[in-house]
């Protein structure tokens, strides 16, 4: 653990406190907590598997030539019969192959699909074309039957309400079914596999097969060594005990380490209604007696920090498709953050306490896009501090600040086993920010060759790119070995005059071991090549160990 941190814009002597308060670079606590060593993080698709097999056409002698006087369209009803006249009438004016009639049926199917009717189609039934009459059958698919297995538990009533909505839609649309499937994946504590079988009868009735599993309690932990000491963030989640789509998660940081860090957080969410609206609330508390010493010339200070945060929000799903989701979140939070600096050398009884009480509102939007070989995610957020409700801060930090932040990520699959992952992040602010609102880079957060709290600032950006390759085999305990290479970098800046920024740059090589279900163990060696690490003046390579597990 590093012993001394030199800060340039600080108090020159204890007597100067009245005229020039201490303004230290701080960190957003949650940015430096242990996190999983996963490529791309939350970019991976989470929607349940849904199969919609294509309807089979009857076998025909496609090259046989026929002469038709009339083509009858049976079934359907969503489109007027006249809709198909421009497509079918030319086939009655000349001799055609049966394959041309089948092609016309496929064109009608494409029209249904292009208009979003997921399991509707047209086909040419077996017939003898007697009297020069041909027939095309339209099947407008709708949900007729649901076969469920497994344990839906307390979610049974919610699922049945959604099913009734789908059954009422004739023909069934892709938009409704995909929204349903994504909403199902967002129910806390419910895991669902679904298969939608297309209609096999002329009435268009389709069968949906569902296999559900209700998991009320899950536990997990993330360990890493990037902070200088091994640390673990333990999580326990209770999901949908009452059937209201509620979830309560408790997180705890252990062991305290040399900095005597104590962090605990409670986060609660609950679905409101059946359309995906979600209420969110959270509370966290952090306190630490930091081992680092703040050095100003001959003076040394010890720092103790305490941070308490209360938050609330409303999640609004705007667009839910299997290939694209768009969510908007309205948020509000309060922060009570204090830092106490005790003079150690010279040994004079003196201390300074800085405190900020923030009242913040904000809005953020998240877009995720999924394709067969690519996944993308992007988010943009704006937060505004309020000069109200007893808000306060120590100059030059502003309590009525405005900050804008965002991130983007993209995963690309190259072949069957290779993957590339790009990540970018930024924060911008024109104001000097309180410690709790500043951006922090280092460790897994765009600075693998550095400790996780290497660089802070009012504004900055980070970027990384990873290439990995997976070796897969069948084994219960370990079935994936994934070596990877990462290059990352970051910049931070302060808006107050005289405070230096930071430049991070590092490269890392590592390997992940996993059973692709419960755990990921990561081992990597990273070397900085920009600023020197604050705990290593020689830019020596750093060994990082991470472990994440989840039960069940």
Tell where the protein language model's regions lie, with residue ranges.
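C-terminal outer-membrane beta-barrel translocator/porin domains of Gram-negative envelope proteins
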Residues: 340-495, 531-537, 543-550
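Outer-membrane beta-barrel "beta-signal"
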Residues: 236, 511-513, 518-520, 539-552
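Transmembrane beta-barrel architecture of outer-membrane proteins
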Residues: 107, 179, 231, 263, ...
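Repeated loop/turn-to-beta-strand initiation elements of outer-membrane beta-barrel proteins
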Residues: 192, 217-219, 241-248, 274-280, ...
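Solvent-exposed loop/turn segments connecting transmembrane beta-strands
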Residues: 224-233, 253-263, 455-458, 462, ...
